């Protein structure tokens, strides 16, 4: 707003000073004083634009005194021109302000809708510390085709991370559908493999031939064991306490929603207090710098050992793609076995 005031008043001041400097016989700049409210209407609110118009109109009238032509028809036309164009500028400012307000309200509604689609994960469930982050590849969007969710009861904790093939509104819609499928399946199926099969069956009618979702499912029943099922998803990364960072290699089934899967394989993974398991989508593994080089996931070992691990991971990704781009949405879920 300060820039708008500065530009408008500077324009008016230059025109007034020029009008004063010109010989009275050629002083015809008063009609141009309307430029000030025209500048104001593009950035200032309605009341401020009206104030600038008032100053421009007062300056145009004053111009008639110092040029001694206030009663001349030409000066009257100039003053009326400033009044008419200034009034139009005020009307333009009002239309602009209303439109900006409407856009802001729509943006708030869209933000609330996007946040409703992507669940807020609990910080602690089933003896596991949980944190999550999401980065959309679409500027201005909060969510896209990547997703995560957590289903927790007294007896079992189940987590999902997935990546829908697709972007934009279509990807968001399908991501919401996948989350719904997960919640239904997680609530009624007894094994993690059956959860994946149930989700696959549910999604088939909603996905066309080119649509699918990769997913990694994690289940915690016993304190020192995790069960994993992969449906075409990148492998989780395990950071062992006092050891290195390594992917968890498990059988990788077909993505969900294809209807081509006969069954899924569960794999049990032991973990100990202090261990951390990173679930991620391919926005992490496929992050490229300006030369097209992929991010080396080994660089994540140091930040994953820190207290605010996911913030550190995102910093590594941002530094890597600087000058390049985050070509896909990125979802991260970190599971930690609390230290005894």
Set out the residue ranges of the language-model regions.
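Catalytic core of PPM/PP2C metal-dependent serine/threonine phosphatase domains
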Residues: 170-249, 264, 335
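Regulatory cytosolic signal-relay segments
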Residues: 82-145
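DG-centered beta-turn motif at the end of beta-strands
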Residues: 45, 163, 233, 280-283, ...
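Hydrophobic, membrane-inserted alpha-helices
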Residues: 10-16, 33-38, 56-61
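Transmembrane alpha-helices and immediately adjacent membrane-cytoplasm interface residues
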Residues: 40, 44, 48-51, 55-103
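Subset of alpha-helical transmembrane segments and adjacent helix-loop junctions
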Residues: 3-8, 15-33, 51-52, 71-77
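Active-site-proximal, acidic helix/loop segment immediately C-terminal to a metal-coordinating Asp/Glu
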Residues: 168-185, 251-252, 265, 271-325, ...
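PP2C/PPM family metal-dependent serine/threonine protein phosphatase catalytic domain
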Residues: 128-141, 200-203, 234-268, 293-294, ...
């Amino acid at each position: 707003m300060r820039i708008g005031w500065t530009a408008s008043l500077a324009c008016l001041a230059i025109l007034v000073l020029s009008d004063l400097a010109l010989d009275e016989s050629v002083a015809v700049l008063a009609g141009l004083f309307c430029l000030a409210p025209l500048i104001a209407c593009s950035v200032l609110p309605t009341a401020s634009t009206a104030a600038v118009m008032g100053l421009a109109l007062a300056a145009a009238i004053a111009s008639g005194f110092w040029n001694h032509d206030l009663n001349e028809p030409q000066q009257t036309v100039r003053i009326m021109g400033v009044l008419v164009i200034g009034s139009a500028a005020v009307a333009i400012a009002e239309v602009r302000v209303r439109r900006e307000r409407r856009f802001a309200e729509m943006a708030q509604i869209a933000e609330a809708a996007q946040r409703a689609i992507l669940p807020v994960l609990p910080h602690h469930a089933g003896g596991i510390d949980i944190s999550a982050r999401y980065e959309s590849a679409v500027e201005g969007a909060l969510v896209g085709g990547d997703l995560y969710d957590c289903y927790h009861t007294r007896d079992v904790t189940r987590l999902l991370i997935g990546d829908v093939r697709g972007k934009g509104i279509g990807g968001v819609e399908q991501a919401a559908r996948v989350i719904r499928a997960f919640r239904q399946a997680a609530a009624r199926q007894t094994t993690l493999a059956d959860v994946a099969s149930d989700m696959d069956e549910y999604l088939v009618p909603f996905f066309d031939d080119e649509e699918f979702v990769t997913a990694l499912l994690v289940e915690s029943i016993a304190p020192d064991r995790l069960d994993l099922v992969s449906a075409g998803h990148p492998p989780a990364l395990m950071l062992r306490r006092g050891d290195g960072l390594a992917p968890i290699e498990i059988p990788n089934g077909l993505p969900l929603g294809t209807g081509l899967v006969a069954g899924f394989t569960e794999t049990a993974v032991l973990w100990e207090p202090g261990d951390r398991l990173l679930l991620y989508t391919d926005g992490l593994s496929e992050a490229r710098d300006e030369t097209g080089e992929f991010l080396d996931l080994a660089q994540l070992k140091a930040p994953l050992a820190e207290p605010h691990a996911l913030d550190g991971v995102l910093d590594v990704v941002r530094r890597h793609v600087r000058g390049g781009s985050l070509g896909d949405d990125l979802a991260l879920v970190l599971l930690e076995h609390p230290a005894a």
